[in-house]
């Protein structure tokens, strides 16, 4: 009996039976009835619906949260599992008070539907006891809606409307069923403090389906560069992943995180650039993961492995190169000043700079040849300090040489005014723009990470001369000046941010020492201070919820795929480590299982990436039109962990009582979209994309409230073209209904670029307390902006 009550409280357990009302009171009241005779068949737990709070806007947390996460079997006295129920769905509309903001709204001509009584629902617990009857009312949607347009923003201090946000995350087919869970009793509950929650049926209100793409499982049949995992049960060869065999859907999920809502058509050049780079890095990380899965003595890493070359081969073979076969003079469509690239091969893929080694790219211009782009990395004693004037050393003369085994270095010689050098000189006469890419190689022994390249914009070549170089031979020097009117490079702004007296600094550390690095607040717009709230670094569970740590693995050193047969944590992740050894996430999964508090592996384990807190120098800043936002003072490589979204974990009943302060309420639910998986199926030969969630496959059970208690994640704004995405992670318990929500970078993010993710609002589905449709413009400024937040 006690166990039945516990499960009912945590999950809003299954409803025993609901007698359908067809041709009855529902139809008499004019309520629209579902198809198939007005009866909606719901699976156990996965199909249970709950009435949503009437809030301004709704966004969901990752898959596996809410009541869809797992099937909880509740037995009655006869020991049988409760039968699948059939529930009559109708439009639900009830007027609720949303606080002072809505009380002040002047809304007229509102028609509310008459309430319709639906037969009470009865919850059955073990032993045949009935907890109580649950009644539901339904009504017609209100017409004569009023459009309320407000300025965008997520800060309560910005004066905008309150919002509840949807976090869209990745899932695949396996997450929709939520079968084979390891723990059916993940939480302990203090019975004296618990009141039975009141689940309700929801009908009619639909939420947006578009957003950050969620990946379905992919299957690779390409033998040359198959991105699959090894066979876990193979005794002949435990470590080598056999390219002659097909990979199962669970073995391959490339993270080239998908497009945002409204951008799947690919009409935007900017969107095409982002999609291509995400595909490239997804393949890179998968190749690296494949190599890291081998025993150390068999790894190619550090022994000539060029994952960028191998990944580019896959993209080129599948026709994913942009601007292939053409040379572009001037701006490359979709490439913006300040864009960062981890590998030089990315410049080739996008058509920014096609030579893989030469520093000067050129094309035919009439009868002459002019330069189209240069890579200035300081290798030729280039002067890179001035942001507007660049002194570039010509190519040739055997200046830059790398000694290879069995080869002798050539003697330096004078540079000649030919090929690229001649093209740069001709650009002076023709006054043609030259793209400049500044490169700074990372000071690390790991060459597989490549260099760091930043697109600086367009320059004009002003003059050139010849002088003696550092090696004693004549070299050509070219002076280029940046064309005015282009955005300033981020590293110039970073220099200003590191000055002793920083303009606009209004708080040194909003975390008050709770984070490893201070998180400052900067406002260069006005005199507004950051909103007051209690900073916390951990998700706050209610008193009645006590997470039960999962079983530990047997590892005493860092967990690896080589120990998949004995490491329980690796086995939970499909027999592979979901991160590269540098901490970058490899692929989007429904849920990532990290090592828990009972595991004996060290803190440096590859399966503890998100448990070390925030490592990046983040700060909040006042935006021009969207309240407070979040940015980073350094470059963020794609796949990097950013932060967790933390707050107070609430049940729906408690969250409904806090509706007056719903700006930071997050409904935990499911979202699934296979748009990126469709793109990956085109990239990788033989891959298949799974189905998307149906319109009715959504539910909600829990909420995270960061209004009064939260961390820096509460300030992250919306964008129609986001650079972050959310991922389910479990480590301190195994209840997939309430996972930790972690933000990861889905792009290479330059310093001081605002960090954003897609709130996934449903257009024309957000209503105020009077039932009127509300509209709010979007000011994200993305090339694929939907122009409306909801």
Curated annotation (Swiss-Prot):
Residues 551-613 form the Pre-SET domain. Keywords: Centromere, Chromatin regulator, Chromosome, Metal-binding, Methyltransferase, Nucleus, S-adenosyl-L-methionine, Transferase, Zinc. Pfam families: Pre-SET, SAD_SRA, SET. Coiled coil: none annotated. Zn(2+) 2 binds at residues 553-554, 569, 595, 599. Residues 251-271 are annotated as: Disordered. Zn(2+) 1 binds at residues 553-555, 559, 567. Residues 774-790 form the Post-SET domain. It catalyses: N(6)-methyl-L-lysyl(9)-[histone H3] + S-adenosyl-L-methionine = N(6),N(6)-dimethyl-L-lysyl(9)-[histone H3] + S-adenosyl-L-homocysteine + H(+); L-lysyl(9)-[histone H3] + S-adenosyl-L-methionine = N(6)-methyl-L-lysyl(9)-[histone H3] + S-adenosyl-L-homocysteine + H(+). GO terms for biological process: methylation. Residues 256-268 have a biased composition (Low complexity). One of its GO terms (cellular component) is nucleus. GO terms for molecular function: histone H3K9me2 methyltransferase activity; methyl-CpG binding; methyl-CpNpG binding; methyl-CpNpN binding; methyltransferase activity; zinc ion binding. S-adenosyl-L-methionine binds at residues 626-628, 662, 664, 714, 717-718. Residues 616-760 form the SET domain. Its EC number is 2.1.1.-, 2.1.1.367. Zn(2+) 3 binds at residues 559, 595, 601, 605. PROSITE patterns: POST_SET, PRE_SET, SAM_MT43_SUVAR39_2, SET, YDG. Zn(2+) 4 binds at residues 720, 778, 780, 785. SUPFAM superfamilies: PUA domain-like, SET domain. Histone methyltransferase. Methylates 'Lys-9' of histone H3. H3 'Lys-9' methylation represents a specific tag for epigenetic transcriptional repression. Seems to act preferentially on dsMRNA. Although the SET domain contains the active site of enzymatic activity, both pre-SET and post-SET domains are required for methyltransferase activity. In the pre-SET domain, Cys residues bind 3 zinc ions that are arranged in a triangular cluster; some of these Cys residues contribute to the binding of two zinc ions within the cluster. This is Histone-lysine N-methyltransferase, H3 lysine-9 specific SUVH6. It comes from Arabidopsis thaliana (Mouse-ear cress).
